[in-house]
């Protein structure tokens, strides 16, 4: 489906130069984000989390919203778009159960444009995606209309080379960029390392549009998963759109609040207890500037701290 013949490959190697005015005046189609704002058209996204933090559940739910043209955690799809979900970790029965849970909370709707490539369903698995064989295998599975490819996950799909070496990542990066030029957005699902960052070479971050990190939080309800989502890279969107979120999942149903709202409540309580902003900063591990910003927001919103008076310490 995506392969080019040798003649066109030779033509593509010739440089194509544009003048500034020519590019500015070029009539390009309007942008159609797959999920606004973090899952762009013709982009690359990295989603990483430690084991048990819900990264596959999250990726599947986001992909389902793309396929149906719906929404997920307040992020809206522009229109329905085809999806190829490539899973190289889960046994086929577990994959089936997760998809059943996903569709059960969506009136059992199974969109025809949501395609699955399961390693467990292949005779010889899925070839490593740093090889021509692996690239060709996945490209042959991409059907017309597919605009989102989900690779879940990098550790099981990328098996050659050294994870921490930038050079080992280069062939895969070149392939992802080639898919991008052909109108395919890729969501790469990966594991977090001990530090909380994505595991392996930082070169993976160079060309991606968005990096999302899911962190599992303590929950009093064993049937409820509580996650903090952070955008550590957010090309093209800022401010409130890039704010951290506190996400909960229970029985396949997702809900969320902005993490800043929870932080405000914590800061408010500390202020009530008479703590100074510098003390709160040290206690929470946030910068003084961030704590000051939250205090200013509460002051503007006329949040009462001490009786009817808003408490602001005298520290500069």
Label the model's feature ranges.
Residues 35, 51, 78-162, 257-261:
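Conserved inter-motif catalytic segment of the P-loop NTP-binding fold
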Residues 83, 186, 291:
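Hydrophobic anchor at the start of a short beta-strand
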Residues 4-9, 143, 181, 220-316:
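C-terminal regions of RecA-like/P-loop NTPase motor modules
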Residues 66-69, 102-105, 157-160, 179, ...:
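Conserved, well-folded catalytic cores of nucleic-acid-processing
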Residues 46-47, 52, 57, 148, ...:
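Phosphate-binding/switch region of NTP-binding enzymes
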Residues 64, 68, 100, 139-140, ...:
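Surface-exposed alpha-helical segments enriched in charged/polar residues
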Residues 31-32, 134, 171-172, 197, ...:
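Amphipathic coiled-coil/heptad-repeat helices and related helical stalk/stem segments
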Residues 9-103, 108-109, 202:
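The Walker A/P-loop phosphate-binding site
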């Amino acid at each position: 489906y995506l392969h080019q013949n040798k003649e066109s490959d030779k033509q593509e190697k010739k440089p194509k130069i544009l003048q500034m005015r020519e590019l500015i005046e070029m009539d390009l189609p309007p942008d159609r984000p797959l999920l606004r704002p973090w899952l762009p058209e013709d982009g690359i996204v990295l989603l990483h989390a430690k084991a048990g933090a819900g990264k596959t559940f999250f990726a599947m739910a986001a992909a389902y919203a793309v396929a149906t043209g719906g929404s997920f955690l307040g992020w809206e799809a522009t229109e329905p778009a085809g999806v190829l979900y490539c899973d190289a970790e889960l046994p086929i029965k577990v994959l089936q159960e997760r998809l059943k849970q996903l569709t059960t909370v969506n009136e059992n709707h199974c969109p025809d444009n949501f395609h699955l490539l399961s390693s467990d369903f292949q005779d010889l698995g899925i070839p490593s995606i740093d090889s021509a064989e692996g690239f060709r295998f996945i490209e042959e599975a991409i059907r017309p209309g597919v605009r989102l490819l989900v690779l879940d996950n990098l550790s099981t799909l990328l098996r050659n080379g050294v994870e921490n070496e930038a050079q080992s990542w280069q062939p895969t990066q070149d392939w992802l960029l080639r898919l991008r030029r052909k109108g395919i957005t890729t969501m790469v699902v990966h594991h977090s390392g001990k530090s909380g960052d994505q595991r392996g070479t930082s070169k993976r971050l160079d060309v991606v549009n968005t990096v999302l990190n899911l962190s599992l939080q303590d929950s009093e309800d064993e049937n409820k998963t509580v996650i903090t989502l952070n955008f550590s890279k957010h090309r093209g969107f800022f401010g409130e759109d890039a704010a951290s979120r506190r996400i909960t999942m229970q029985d396949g149903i997702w809900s969320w609040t902005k993490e800043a709202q929870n932080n405000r409540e914590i800061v408010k309580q500390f202020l009530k207890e008479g703590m100074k902003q510098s003390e709160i900063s040290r206690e929470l591990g946030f910068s003084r500037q961030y704590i000051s910003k939250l205090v200013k927001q509460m002051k503007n919103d006329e949040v009462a701290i001490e009786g009817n008076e808003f408490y602001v310490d005298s520290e500069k």
